[in-house]
Amino acid sequence: MAGLEDTTDLRLPSASEPIKNIVLVGRTGNGKSATGNSLIGKQVFRSETRATGVTMKCETCVAVTPCGTGINVIDTPGLFDLSVSAEYLSQEIINCLVLAEDGLHAVVLVLSVRTRISQEEEATLNTLQVIFGSQIIDYLVVLFTGGDELEANNMTLDDYLSKGCPEFLKTVLRLCGGRRILFDNRTTDEGKKVKQVQELLAHVAAIEKSTSGIPFTDEMHRKIQKEAETLREQQKEVESKDLAAAEIEKWKKHYQTEHDKNMNMMAEMLGNRLREDSERQEKMLLALRDNLEISQRQNKLNELTDNEPDLIHCGVSLRRMPCNML
């Protein structure tokens, strides 16, 4: 599993330059892990072509890009797949925020030009807004994988988007200021690898400028930060006391248990919020379906009503005709 332990042979960013926290989200199979590897410049996230996702837990890796920017890339599992339970999603969202304790500098929605954009992509944006609020769009970048396929067909990203771009995607691109980028995760061209990473970091820089350099945090994120700070202070205080090693370990374990309990409570609250939203969405879909059926029945009734006068007129005319003409 990729994680902070995988960064030992990677250059670490200097303390004077804050690390950019970049989280990758999207449907299983869209190439999140491969994109993370492209950003890091090394195979640290497991990436394979299969029906089920390889990444099962949020994973992170810190490195310095060729242009000198320190990044913390967070690879998420298929958090927003329709098959994912609210409990699993809420726990992994909490884990994701723990890995980006100082806030999110960019949320990268990973799509693929190789597959049709589905309801799951649309659900991703809705779920992000349910969890974080509408402000999360200010930090969104839409990244398309499969650049090699478009290049083989002599197509640009704009060519691809001009051919039947779903309304959902048009809305997303409009809301995030058109921040989009095409990635080729299969290229062996070192210059191309560097260029596409630089292009993504340019979008991150643009986000920083538009948000006054303030990374995204919300109430839940701030609670997580406070919990982490409290745990550090408690453990530091225990270590400063003249206690036996076993006693120190006992208190550390106690504080860690309390911390985990509070984190689980937050995950449970988030899970309840997600379930409520899911139920609301289902009710809306049922209402739309019912309204559509009512509308279709009304249209059929109107068609019959429109034809009725002609039938009545014909019947009256026949009754008034002379007998010798019948």
Swiss-Prot record:
Residues 184-186 are annotated as: G5. This is Immune-associated nucleotide-binding protein 4. Belongs to the TRAFAC class TrmE-Era-EngA-EngB-Septin-like GTPase superfamily. AIG1/Toc34/Toc159-like paraseptin GTPase family. IAN subfamily. Residues 53-57 are annotated as: G2. Residues 26-33 are annotated as: G1. PROSITE patterns: G_AIG1. GO terms for cellular component: endoplasmic reticulum; plasma membrane. The keyword Repeat does not apply. GTP binds at G26, R27, T28, G29, N30, G31, K32, S33, A34, S47, N185. Residues 145-148 are annotated as: G4. GO terms for molecular function: GTP binding. Expressed in radicles of the germinating seeds.
